[in-house]
Swiss-Prot record:
Miscellaneous comment text of the record: The thiolation reaction likely consists of two steps: a first activation step by ATP to form an adenylated intermediate of the target base of tRNA, and a second nucleophilic substitution step of the sulfur (S) atom supplied by the hydrosulfide attached to the Fe-S cluster.
Lineage, highest ranks first: Bacteria, Pseudomonadati, Pseudomonadota, Gammaproteobacteria, Thiotrichales
Species whose genome carries this gene: Francisella tularensis subsp. novicida (strain U112)
Parts of the chain that traverse the membrane: none
Motif PP-loop motif positions after renumbering to this chain: 42-47
Homology family: Belongs to the TtcA family.
Cofactor note text: Binds 1 [4Fe-4S] cluster per subunit. The cluster is chelated by three Cys residues, the fourth Fe has a free coordination site that may bind a sulfur atom transferred from the persulfide of IscS.
Job description of the protein: Catalyzes the ATP-dependent 2-thiolation of cytidine in position 32 of tRNA, to form 2-thiocytidine (s(2)C32). The sulfur atoms are provided by the cysteine/cysteine desulfurase (IscS) system.
Record-linked HAMAP family: TtcA
One Pfam family matching this protein: ATP_bind_3
MF terms (GO), sorted A to Z: 4 iron, 4 sulfur cluster binding; ATP binding; magnesium ion binding; sulfurtransferase activity; tRNA binding
Name used for this protein in its record: tRNA-cytidine(32) 2-sulfurtransferase 1
Subunit structure: Homodimer.
Keywords: 4Fe-4S, ATP-binding, Cytoplasm, Iron, Iron-sulfur, Magnesium, Metal-binding, Nucleotide-binding, RNA-binding, Transferase, tRNA processing, tRNA-binding
EC number(s) from the headed UniProt entry: 2.8.1.-
């Protein structure tokens, strides 16, 4: 950070992100007294931002909770092994580096030129969930932000024929872990600017050489074009995700359409 203007910008932005993070945590009751929170730290801008916000809230919160930062070293070529340990030691944050060669597995299974992100993320999730259970973690914190949630909604809508996104809080399918997304109300624009001002030691996410998920790239570009024409478009879409009317949809599991009959008419 080079000047007073940058410092003032950082301070204002930090307060803004912290406020949104606290709102999401409170609204969805993400953190309870005595929680042990595992922050999944990839070395990307969003997970750095998440860790920073939780550390700030830890100092101010009326409840007590532990934080442990966990990184999975997947043995990708060129991965800078010293970056995260040095950063976390300097901050005085408890951390653990899990070392698992998923890179070789993914490269063996996925054909050349195909995106490896899907299999890689599933393997990563399983390893992190196992670590959380083995170390008595009560909440697994992920760095997904508002834009990730909106993009996932449209990915499912366009390509899977389903209406679903990313919840701010969930109990994993196997009931072993609770996953929280404290940055759910924060935009990617905010995490990007914050990471630049804080000068986080970013680790690229494409060390494996995988191609970007073209479907997600298409959705992201589409949303950005919409946002250019209407700066509130993403906010409106995000608001819609918590303003659902089951009776105005077509899902018989969410609303009892079958038993609506002429006997219900009131005149």
């Amino acid at each position: 950070m080079t000047n007073n203007t940058d410092k003032q910008t950082l301070k204002k932005l930090e307060r803004q992100i912290l406020r949104k993070t606290a709102q999401a945590i409170n609204q969805y009751n993400m953190i309870e007294d005595g929680d042990k929170i595992m922050v999944c730290l990839s070395g990307g801008k969003d997970s750095y931002c998440l860790l920073e916000m939780l550390l700030l809230l830890q100092k101010k919160a009326p409840i007590s909770f532990e934080i442990i930062a966990v990184n999975l070293d997947q043995k990708q070529p060129g991965f800078p092994e010293e970056v995260l340990p040095n950063y976390l030691k300097n901050k005085g944050v408890e951390f653990h580096i899990i070392q698992r060669d998923t890179y070789s597995v993914v490269k063996r299974v996925i054909p050349e030129g195909k995106t490896t992100c899907g299999l890689c993320s599933r393997m990563r999730r399983g390893i992190l969930y196992d670590f959380a259970e083995e170390n008595s973690v009560t909440k697994v914190a992920l760095g997904h932000h508002r834009d990730d949630i909106i993009e996932t909604f449209f990915l499912n809508l366009f390509y899977n024929g389903s209406i679903k996104a990313m919840p701010a809080k969930l109990l994993s399918d196997d009931k072993r872990n609770i996953v929280i997304r404290p940055l759910a109300f924060v935009s990617e624009k905010e995490t990007l600017e914050y990471s630049q001002l804080k000068e986080f030691p970013i680790i690229p996410c494409n060390l494996c050489g995988s191609q970007d998920n073209l479907q997600r790239v298409f959705i992201k570009d589409m949303l950005n074009r919409w946002e250019q024409n209407n700066p509130e478009r993403k906010n409106v879409i995000f608001k819609a995700l918590s303003n659902i009317s089951p009776s105005q949809m077509l899902d018989k599991e969410l609303f009892d359409f079958i038993n609506i009959s002429k006997d219900d008419i009131q005149r």
